[in-house]
């Protein structure tokens, strides 16, 4: 079984749905589509751990490779019965580190689950900001399309969300195109 099928299967095994009725695979595909749209922002030539130019692609993982895998697995630790080590075995350490970073903390509400420590972990993990943005963009696109109440919640959260991810409109940011795209989704 390839890693995409493995990620989808973990959500199936826990009867995990998106918006209460869609197979969770729908959301994973949406997040991966956003990744594909913005993958040009990611390095695809150099190995993440060493910085060496990739000469053996299946054995050397670039930031682009790790993020692609992490978009498929971004909710595994949070929503299924798999551990960090399970994810590491199936998707590799680089993707597992990203997935771990975007996994919500324990908390009684959204604010507690996604506090300062959570966002610090995302900012300090290579690729995690990209994957978190892919997830948020997919959720906002879906919320806008379905006129979901979640769309208004994401709109309200957006200024703090982008601040916590380290975006400043007055400074260059490698993911600036993604932040602009996300902001534009909230325009009427």
Where would I find each of the regions flagged by the language model?
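Active-site helical microenvironments for divalent-metal-assisted chemistry
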Residues: 1-188
């Amino acid at each position: 079984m390839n890693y995409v099928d493995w990620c989808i299967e973990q959500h199936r095994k826990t009867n995990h749905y998106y918006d209460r009725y869609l197979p969770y695979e729908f959301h994973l595909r949406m997040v991966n589509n956003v990744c594909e749209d913005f993958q040009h922002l990611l390095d695809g030539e150099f190995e993440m751990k060493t910085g060496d130019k990739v000469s053996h692609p299946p054995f050397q993982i670039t930031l682009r490779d790790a993020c692609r895998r992490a978009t498929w697995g971004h909710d595994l630790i949070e929503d299924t019965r798999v551990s960090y080590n399970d994810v590491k075995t199936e998707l590799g350490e680089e993707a597992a580190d990203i997935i771990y970073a975007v996994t919500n903390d324990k908390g009684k509400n959204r604010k507690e689950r996604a506090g300062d420590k959570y966002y610090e972990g995302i900012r300090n993990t290579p690729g995690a900001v990209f994957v978190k943005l892919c997830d948020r963009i997919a959720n906002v696109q879906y919320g806008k399309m379905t006129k979901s109440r979640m769309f208004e919640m994401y709109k309200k959260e957006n200024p703090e969300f982008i601040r916590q991810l380290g975006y400043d409109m007055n400074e260059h940011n490698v993911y600036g195109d993604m932040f602009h795209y996300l902001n534009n989704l909230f325009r009427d």
